[in-house]
C-alpha cells in the first residue's frame, strides 16, 4: 500500500479539478442536467472534446479528427481522478491511487454533493446518496409513535412490566432512527415488532411499498444491492458466463476494490457517451447501474465479503432494457414476502399457531447468527404463544392484545380497529363483529378482500388472482367446518346469555311493579350490558362469561303465598310444604353450582345447572297451580342425578385451616402396661409461619383404651399467598406425637410419632389420612386417623362427581286431577312413579341384569377415579346417570304394568339372548377374545333373567 510522504492537502482539490474538466455532471433521469430538448448538447460536446483532446472545438473541426477511443477516455478519466499532490511528489500507478482511502472518501463526497444538488434541496442532513430510506424511516417513525402510545397506555393501567418492555423497544427504535438518518445501514431484524394495541396496520402499509430501495440497505451482503437495480435484474439471465471468467484469475487481476471502481467508471463514461449521442434513456440506465456500485463499495470498505459473480457485465455487453422493466423489479423483491406470510387463518387457534411458528423460525435464525439476545427475546414470545394456545384449548379466554404481532402479520380478531385507550368490552366486541362480518361477507366482496390483504404486494398478487379464487370457492365448505365443531359450545354460550338477559328483564319488571325504581334501573342496565356479548356470541366469538352478572332470585317464586284451593286437607297442605322445601333447596344448589362454574368459565356445566334451575322453577309452578286449584299433590318421584360439582367449604375463610384428630387405632402399649391401662393424648406441631413460632396444641386425655376416639378439631391460621406456607405444606407437613399420660411422679411417655403430608392441598381442599405410628423408623402397628380441611384448593378448583336424589314433579293434567293420594290416607310425602300407558313404546326395554352389570362397572370406574383424586369425565357421569334413570323407569314399568308389558319384556329378552349369542360367536371367530368373553357373559345374564321370568 502506498503511503504519502507529505501532509495531505486540503480536501476537495481532486473534486475541484474534476469539476473543471467537466467529468462530474449529474446524469440523473430527472432531467436537471440532461434536458430533453437538447439545448445544452453543444456545450456538452465542447466539454467532452476538451476533455479528450485538449483543443477547442473549432480546431477539432478544422482538423477533422473524431473522438478518441474508449481506452483513451479511461486513461484521461483516471488521470483526472488523481490527486495533484501525488502527481508532483511521485508517479504512482492507478491501482495504488484508487486503493487510497482518503481519495475514495473524497470522491464519494464529491459524488454525494453532485447528487444532492441534482435532487431536492431540503434534505441537507443526508450527505450520502444512498442514505434516504423513505420506507424504513416512515416505518420507524410510526413504530416509534406506536410504542409511545403503548407506554402511555401501560402507565395509565399501572402495568410496570409492560412499561419496561415497551421502553426498551422505544430506545431501540430511537437508535435505529438516528442511524438511518445518519445514512448508516440497519438490520431489518433489529426493528422491534409492532404492539397489538390497535394501530398495527399503520406500520405495515408503509413498510412494504418500497421493497426496491431499502432492500440494498438492509441486507448485510452486498449482492442484493447490485441485483436489485433495474439493469442488473436482467443481467444474470444473459451474463452468467461473462461474470464467472472474471473470478478465476484472482492473482493476475487487480483487487476487488479496483475492479469495482473500474467497472463503475466504465458505466459513468458509458452514460456520458450515451448522453452525447442523445440517448437519454441509456444514459440514465447506465448512471443507475453506476450508482448501484456505491453500496457494494461501502460494504467492501467495511470489510464485508463481496461476491463478484453478481457483478454487472461491462456496458457494451449489457443486454437491452425491455420497455417494461419498472414492473419487473418488484416481482423478485416482493415474492419472498408473499411466501413468508401464511394464508389468512380460519380460527383463532390457527392464527396463534402461525404466529408462534414465525417466532420459532426467527429464534432459530437468531441462534444460527449467534445473536443470543434476539434468540432469547423470540423464545420468550414463543412461550407466550404456547401459553395462549394451551389456554384456548382449555376453553379459557385469550387476551390477544397482550401478544406481540410478527412483522407482516395482521393483528388477530380486528384489534387494528380498536384504539389503545379504548378498554371497554363493548368496543372490543364491536370490532370483532366487524372483522367477522368482513370474513363471512358475500362472494361479491371477494375481490376487495385480497386487495386489502395483499396491498403491499399488489404487482405480484394480480397474476395469482384467478387461481386464488378457485381454492376459496372450493374450500368454502371446509371453512365452515370449524364452526360446526364448536357449534355446541357457541349455542350453549348464546342460550346462557339470552336466558340471563331474560331473567334480568323479568327482575326489572318485578322491581318496577313493586315501585323499586333503583332496582329496576340496575337490572335494566345489567340486561343492556349483555347486548354486546350477545352480538359477539351470535357471530361465533368467545365471550368471558365470568363478567356476566348473577341471576336475580325472587323469593316469592318458591313459596306458596296464595291461599289453598277448596277441599284441601291439612295432610295434603303439609305434603305441599315438604315438596316446596325440597324444590327450593334444589334450586339454591343449582344456582350455587352455576355461579361457581361461571367464575371458572365452564359454559357446559353452567348451562347444565341453569337448565336444572329452570326445571325447578317449572316444578314449583306446577305445585302452585295444583295448590291453588285444591288438587292433591302432583305425581312426584325421586331420580338419581350425577353432577360434577366444585368442592368447597364456604364456612371457612381463606386464612383458616381446620385440623381434625379423629381417633387412634391399636396404639402401642409400653412395657408393663396393658391396653386397658393406656391414658392417651395427641399433640401436634405445625411449623408455620416458622419453626420458632410454630402452631402447637394437644387433645384431651382419653383413658383406659388403646383405641381412643378424640374427635377434636383445631383451627390453624394460614396465609395462602405466603411462600413460607407453600414451603411448609410441600416439605414439612404436620408432626403428631402419641403420648401416654404419666401419673404421680411419672413423666409423659411418647408412644410414637406420625407425619402428615399436606402437598395434596394443592389440588384438594380436604386431606383425610390414616397415619402409621412409628417408633423412630420402626412401625409400631398403631394408627392415627386425622383430617385437614381448607376453604378451597391452593392452585385449582377441585371437581368431584356426586350423586343426588333429585325430586321430579310430573305436570298436572288440565281437566282430570291426579289421583295419587286420594284413596290412601297415609301416602308418603313423595309418591311412587305413576303408570303411563304410552311409556311402553316411548323407550326400548333392556335386560335389568345387563343394566345392573353396566352400572356396577361404571361405579367401580368412578370409585377408582375418586381414589386417585382425578375428575370423572362428563361422558362417564352422563352414561352412569342414563343407566340409573333407565333402570328405575323400567322397574317401575314392570311393577305397575300388567301381563302385556311382561310379555313384551320376555320377547325383548329372547331377542337380546339371540343377539349376544351371535355376537359372541362372531367376535370369537374374528379373534377378539376379550370382547367375545364380555358378550358371552352378557348372554348368560340375559338367559338367567329369562329363566327367572318364566318361572
From Swiss-Prot:
Organism superkingdom: Eukaryota
Stretch forming the signal peptide: none
GO biological process per UniProt: apical dendrite arborization; endosome organization; negative regulation of snRNA transcription by RNA polymerase II; positive regulation of canonical NF-kappaB signal transduction; regulation of postsynapse assembly; regulation of respiratory gaseous exchange by nervous system process; regulation of transcription by RNA polymerase II
Cited SUPFAM superfamilies: C2 domain (Calcium/lipid-binding domain, CaLB) (SSF49562)
GO cellular component, one term: cytosol
GO MF terms held by the record: cadherin binding; DNA-binding transcription factor activity, RNA polymerase II-specific; DNA-binding transcription repressor activity, RNA polymerase II-specific; RNA polymerase II cis-regulatory region sequence-specific DNA binding
Major site of localization recorded for this protein: cytoplasm
Ranges of compositional bias, category Acidic residues: 84-104
This protein's UniProt keywords: Coiled coil, Cytoplasm, Cytoskeleton, DNA-binding, Intellectual disability, Nucleus, Phosphoprotein, Repressor, Transcription, Transcription regulation
Pfam family, one: CC2D1A-B_DM14
Coiled-coil region(s): 346-392, 484-517
Job of this protein: Transcription factor that binds specifically to the DRE (dual repressor element) and represses HTR1A gene transcription in neuronal cells. The combination of calcium and ATP specifically inactivates the binding with FRE. May play a role in the altered regulation of HTR1A associated with anxiety and major depression. Mediates HDAC-independent repression of HTR1A promoter in neuronal cell. Performs essential function in controlling functional maturation of synapses. Plays distinct roles depending on its localization. When cytoplasmic, acts as a scaffold protein in the PI3K/PDK1/AKT pathway.
This protein's domain notes: The C2 domain is required for the repression.
UniProt name for this protein: Coiled-coil and C2 domain-containing protein 1A
Amino acid at each position: 500500500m502506498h503511503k504519502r510522504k507529505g501532509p495531505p492537502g486540503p480536501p476537495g482539490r481532486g473534486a475541484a479539478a474534476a469539476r473543471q474538466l467537466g467529468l462530474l455532471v449529474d446524469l440523473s433521469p430527472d432531467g436537471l442536467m440532461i434536458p430533453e430538448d437538447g439545448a445544452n448538447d453543444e456545450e456538452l460536446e465542447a466539454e467532452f472534446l476538451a476533455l479528450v483532446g485538449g483543443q477547442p472545438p473549432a480546431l477539432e473541426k478544422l482538423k477533422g479528427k473524431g473522438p478518441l477511443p474508449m481506452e483513451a477516455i479511461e486513461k484521461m478519466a483516471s488521470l483526472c481522478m488523481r490527486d495533484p499532490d501525488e502527481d508532483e511528489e511521485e508517479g504512482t500507478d492507478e491501482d495504488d491511487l484508487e486503493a487510497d482511502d482518503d481519495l475514495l472518501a473524497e470522491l464519494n463526497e464529491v459524488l454525494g454533493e453532485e447528487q444532492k444538488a441534482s435532487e431536492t434541496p431540503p434534505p441537507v442532513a443526508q450527505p450520502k446518496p444512498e442514505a434516504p430510506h423513505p420506507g424504513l424511516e416512515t416505518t420507524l417513525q410510526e413504530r416509534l409513535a406506536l410504542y409511545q402510545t403503548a407506554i402511555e397506555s401501560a402507565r395509565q393501567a399501572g402495568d410496570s412490566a409492560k412499561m419496561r418492555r415497551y421502553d426498551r423497544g422505544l430506545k431501540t427504535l430511537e437508535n435505529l432512527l438516528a442511524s438511518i438518518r445518519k445514512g448508516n445501514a440497519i438490520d431489518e431484524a433489529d426493528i422491534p415488532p409492532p404492539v397489538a394495541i390497535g394501530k398495527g396496520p399503520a406500520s405495515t402499509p408503509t413498510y412494504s411499498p418500497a421493497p426496491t430501495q431499502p432492500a440494498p440497505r438492509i441486507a448485510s451482503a452486498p449482492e442484493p444491492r447490485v441485483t436489485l437495480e433495474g439493469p442488473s435484474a436482467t443481467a444474470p439471465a444473459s451474463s452468467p458466463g461473462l461474470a464467472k471468467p472474471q473470478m478465476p484469475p484472482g492473482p493476475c487481476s487487480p483487487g476487488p476494490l479496483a475492479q469495482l471502481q473500474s467497472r463503475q467508471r466504465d458505466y459513468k463514461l458509458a452514460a456520458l457517451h450515451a448522453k452525447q449521442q442523445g440517448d437519454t434513456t441509456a444514459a440514465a440506465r447506465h448512471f443507475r447501474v453506476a450508482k448501484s456500485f456505491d453500496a457494494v463499495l461501502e460494504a467492501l470498505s467495511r470489510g464485508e465479503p463481496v461476491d463478484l459473480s453478481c457483478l454487472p457485465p461491462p456496458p457494451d455487453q449489457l443486454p437491452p432494457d425491455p420497455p417494461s422493466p419498472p414492473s419487473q423489479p418488484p416481482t423478485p423483491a416482493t415474492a419472498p414476502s408473499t411466501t413468508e406470510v401464511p394464508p389468512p387463518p380460519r380460527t383463532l387457534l390457527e392464527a396463534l399457531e402461525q404466529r408462534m411458528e414465525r417466532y420459532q423460525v426467527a429464534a432459530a435464525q437468531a441462534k444460527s447468527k449467534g445473536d443470543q439476545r434476539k434468540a432469547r427475546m423470540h423464545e420468550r414470545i414463543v412461550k407466550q404463544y404456547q401459553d395462549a394456545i394451551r389456554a384456548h384449548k382449555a376453553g379459557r379466554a385469550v387476551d390477544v392484545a397482550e401478544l406481540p404481532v410478527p412483522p407482516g402479520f395482521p393483528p388477530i380478531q380486528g384489534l387494528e380497529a380498536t384504539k389503545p385507550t379504548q378498554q371497554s368490552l363493548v368496543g372490543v366486541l364491536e370490532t370483532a363483529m366487524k372483522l367477522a362480518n368482513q370474513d363471512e361477507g358475500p362472494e361479491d366482496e371477494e375481490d376487495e378482500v385480497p386487495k386489502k390483504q395483499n396491498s403491499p404486494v399488489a404487482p405480484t398478487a394480480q397474476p395469482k388472482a384467478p387461481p386464488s379464487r378457485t381454492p376459496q370457492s372450493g374450500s368454502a365448505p371446509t371453512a365452515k367446518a370449524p364452526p360446526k365443531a364448536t357449534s355446541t359450545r357457541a349455542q350453549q354460550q348464546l342460550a346462557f346469555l339470552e336466558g340471563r338477559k331474560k331473567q334480568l328483564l323479568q327482575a326489572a319488571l318485578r322491581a318496577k311493579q313493586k315501585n323499586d325504581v333503583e332496582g329496576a334501573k340496575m337490572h335494566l342496565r345489567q340486561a343492556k350490558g349483555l347486548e354486546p356479548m350477545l352480538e359477539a356470541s351470535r357471530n361465533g366469538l368467545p365471550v368471558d362469561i365470568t363478567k356476566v352478572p348473577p341471576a336475580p332470585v325472587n323469593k316469592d317464586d318458591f313459596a306458596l303465598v296464595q291461599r289453598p284451593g277448596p277441599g284441601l286437607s291439612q295432610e295434603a297442605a303439609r305434603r305441599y310444604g315438604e315438596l316446596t322445601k325440597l324444590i327450593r333447596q334444589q334450586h339454591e344448589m343449582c344456582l350455587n353450582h352455576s355461579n361457581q362454574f361461571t367464575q371458572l368459565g365452564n359454559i357446559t356445566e353452567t348451562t347444565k345447572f341453569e337448565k336444572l334451575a329452570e326445571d325447578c322453577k317449572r316444578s314449583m309452578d306446577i305445585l302452585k297451580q295444583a295448590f291453588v286449584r285444591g288438587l292433591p299433590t302432583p305425581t312426584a318421584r325421586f331420580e338419581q342425578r350425577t353432577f360434577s360439582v366444585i368442592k368447597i367449604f364456604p364456612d371457612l375463610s381463606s386464612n383458616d385451616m381446620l385440623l381434625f384428630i379423629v381417633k387412634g387405632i391399636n396404639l402401642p402399649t409400653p412395657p408393663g402396661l396393658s391396653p386397658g391401662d393406656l391414658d392417651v393424648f395427641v399433640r401436634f406441631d405445625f411449623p408455620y409461619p416458622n419453626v420458632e413460632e410454630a402452631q402447637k396444641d394437644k387433645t384431651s386425655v382419653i383413658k383406659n383404651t388403646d383405641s381412643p376416639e378424640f374427635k377434636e378439631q383445631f383451627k390453624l391460621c394460614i396465609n395462602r399467598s405466603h411462600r413460607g406456607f407453600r414451603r411448609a405444606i410441600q416439605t414439612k407437613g404436620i408432626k403428631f406425637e402419641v403420648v401416654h399420660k404419666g401419673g404421680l411422679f411419672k413423666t409423659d411417655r411418647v408412644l410414637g410419632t406420625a407425619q402428615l403430608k399436606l402437598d395434596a392441598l394443592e389440588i384438594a381442599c380436604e386431606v383425610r389420612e390414616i397415619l402409621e405410628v412409628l417408633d423412630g423408623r420402626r412401625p409400631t402397628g398403631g394408627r392415627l386417623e386425622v383430617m385437614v380441611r381448607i376453604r378451597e384448593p391452593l392452585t385449582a378448583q377441585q371437581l368431584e362427581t356426586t350423586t343426588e336424589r333429585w325430586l321430579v314433579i310430573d305436570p298436572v293434567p288440565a281437566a282430570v286431577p291426579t289421583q295419587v293420594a286420594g284413596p290412601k290416607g297415609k301416602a308418603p310425602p313423595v309418591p311412587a312413579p305413576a303408570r303411563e300407558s304410552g311409556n311402553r313404546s316411548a323407550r326400548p326395554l333392556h335386560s335389568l341384569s345387563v343394566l345392573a352389570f353396566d352400572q356396577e362397572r361404571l361405579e367401580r370406574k368412578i370409585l377408582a377415579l375418586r381414589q386417585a383424586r382425578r375428575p370423572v369425565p362428563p361422558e362417564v357421569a352422563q352414561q352412569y346417570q342414563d343407566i340409573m334413570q333407565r333402570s328405575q323407569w323400567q322397574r317401575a314399568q314392570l311393577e305397575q304394568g300388567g301381563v302385556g308389558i311382561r310379555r313384551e319384556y320376555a320377547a325383548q329378552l329372547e331377542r337380546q339372548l339371540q343377539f349376544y349369542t351371535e355376537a359372541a360367536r362372531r367376535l370369537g371367530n374374528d379373534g377378539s377374545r376379550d370382547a367375545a368373553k364380555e358378550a358371552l357373559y352378557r348372554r348368560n345374564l340375559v338367559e338367567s333373567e329369562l329363566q327367572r321370568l318364566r318361572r
